[in-house]
Amino acid sequence: MGLWAELCISLRGLSFFLVLMTGEGTRGGSFKESLGVCSKQTLLVPLRYNESYSQPVYKPYLTLCAGRRICSTYRTTYRVAWREVRREVPQTHVVCCQGWKKPHPGALTCDAICSKPCLNGGVCTGPDRCECAPGWGGKHCHVDVDECRASLTLCSHGCLNTLGSFLCSCPHPLVLGLDGRTCAGGPPESPTSASILSVAVREADSEEERALRWEVAELRGRLEKLEQWATQAGAWVRAVLPMPPEELRPEQVAELWGRGDRIESLSDQVLLLEERLGACACEDNSLGPSLRG
């Protein structure tokens, strides 16, 4: 076997020896317990490898000594030689608990197994257990947490929930502070701009109120017609019910239920619009034109 082949074999054996001595996944050869490790075994593994060393070589030669005599002596030189080394080295082997696995076969740690991945930055910290990032919840970190409904007040005024977070808002003329949560006074406005804004707001409120009143009136008219029909239908039902139920035609039953659903829906719409109208207030706390007198 040539010198180059012996060198390759020795380097492979030495690298394997160093891996076993340092320990896979550890530093300084020390083993650190981790979560999910059920058992640990340290075995002595026989290892055979080649190592290099300096071999002395003695070369004799003749020289001239004192008295003109010829003397025999030698000089020492060194060359790189190889020798086979056998020794037993400790090797640690771990067994993972149920619900845990090794990241690779030679690892000394175990990672948790989650049947479904942890979403939105979540981390699998135990068997089918996710540790979610702030703003997310649920078993797999797939549910957005509504911070605005939390018991802890996050915003001094308005709060808008977003995916994984929230935003704070401020009413006019306040502005959001540097902390992004509290409101502070904004820059002073000129009287002209303030008066223009006030007029625009009053005009917008007036137009919205007229539109709401027209919509309420229209819905009330439709509701009155349906109530009249319901009265007539009630009399028809009372006249029909004494007959056996199997004699009722399916289209009559379907029409009766459909009209009833429309009446209920219109009643809800009218109630909602009346509540919105009741929330309107004049600037000087006076009654509107329709409520005076």
UniProtKB/Swiss-Prot annotation:
Name it.
Answer: Epidermal growth factor-like protein 8
| Signal peptide location | 1-28
Taking the first listed entry, what is the main subcellular location of this protein, grouped into a coarse class? secreted
The organism is: Mus musculus
Q: List the Gene3D superfamilies.
A: Laminin
Q: Name one GO molecular function term.
A: calcium ion binding
Q: What is the lineage of its organism?
A: Eukaryota, Metazoa, Chordata, Craniata, Vertebrata
Q: Which residues form the EMI domain?
A: 34-112
Source domain of life is Eukaryota
